[in-house]
Amino acid sequence: MGCTVSAEDKAAAERSKMIDKNLREDGEKAAREVKLLLLGAGESGKSTIVKQMKIIHEDGYSEEECRQYRAVVYSNTIQSIMAIVKAMGNLQIDFADPQRADDARQLFALSCAAEEQGMLPEDLSGVIRRLWADHGVQACFGRSREYQLNDSAAYYLNDLERIAQSDYIPTQQDVLRTRVKTTGIVETHFTFKDLHFKMFDVGGQRSERKKWIHCFEGVTAIIFCVALSAYDLVLAEDEEMNRMHESMKLFDSICNNKWFTDTSIILFLNKKDLFEEKITQSSLTICFPEYTGANKYDEAASYIQSKFEDLNKRKDTKEIYTHFTCATDTKNVQFVFDAVTDVIIKNNLKDCGLF
């Protein structure tokens, strides 16, 4: 009898060992699967981060894929110069050279067909080049916080000669700079540091936010993007609302949401390059009247960081991992994402009882 019990005990111990091994393997597998949700207000740089993941972790854009972005580059360039010229009327800025008024008429006459065909004809590129060189147009561009203008306007317009070539193929950087409003949810998969990432980019405009909710289940981490340079801008969809205030309101609702009690929150204070250019010209008091510091990058950026981190109501149990980013700078994003991944690995292993 004793031998029988001993054999049963041995078999039970083996089974228990096998169950433990399976549980551990399942735990390790779960720890390697990462669901990342990219959130943030419109035009905060979420889609650019997704494009960077393709460049960094998936060998970038092929020549054919780059070619497909040509029409978007043309459209962004045309839309940018049109926005500036339209704003000149509202801001009562005159062309330095009166002949540019004819070019402006030509711009509006030619642009519709060019955008529809995904082209930049020679006559239109000449019109755009002359307009962009005008001092009145440049003065209006300098006041771009007073109207809605694509962040990449100067990037494309300054490089018009290259873009207008008949054999033009967009570079990786050109692709990164393109702006297409995200509607719905864009899912990207990639592997990094033995982790299998599923990244979800959702539209930031108010009308798109109702689509977020079904993405929330089982989220490992949220990357919340904020455009630092938007502190003196209003929303495209609500011209009464400051963009930074809208971002803070949204971050508050995400950071303190009961569904995200155990979710890592990573804060990307993005567009640091544009913010550094702008802060010396446009005071932070536009957004934060109580701000008494200098209009210098380090001090102003730290102040914005503290405003966001102070929204966290569970500081004792929840940490916000903040990074200053420039989403169009591949090296910067690579460095930051490396640090983010280390945090995710540590937190995942902790959750699975393996750390």
Curated annotation (Swiss-Prot):
Residues 197-206 are annotated as: G3 motif. GO terms for molecular function: G-protein beta/gamma-subunit complex binding; GTP binding; GTPase activity; metal ion binding. Mg(2+) binds at S47, T182. Residues 325-330 are annotated as: G5 motif. The gene is Gnai2. A lipid is attached at C3 (S-palmitoyl cysteine). Residues 266-273 are annotated as: G4 motif. A lipid is attached at G2 (N-myristoyl glycine). Belongs to the G-alpha family. G(i/o/t/z) subfamily. This is Guanine nucleotide-binding protein G(i) subunit alpha-2. Keywords: Cell cycle, Cell division, Cell membrane, Cytoplasm, Cytoskeleton, GTP-binding, Lipoprotein, Magnesium, Membrane, Metal-binding, Myristate, Nucleotide-binding, Palmitate, Transducer. PANTHER family: GTP-BINDING PROTEIN ALPHA SUBUNIT (PTHR10218), GUANINE NUCLEOTIDE-BINDING PROTEIN G(I) SUBUNIT ALPHA-2 (PTHR10218:SF73). Residues 35-48 are annotated as: G1 motif. It is found in: Cytoplasm; Cytoplasm, Cytoskeleton, Microtubule organizing center, Centrosome; Cell membrane; Membrane. InterPro entries: Gprotein_alpha_I, Gprotein_alpha_su, GproteinA_insert, P-loop_NTPase. Pfam families: G-alpha. It comes from Mus musculus. GTP binds at residues 40-47, 176-182, 201-205, 270-273, 327. It is a lipid-anchor. Residues 174-182 are annotated as: G2 motif. It comes from the Eukaryota.
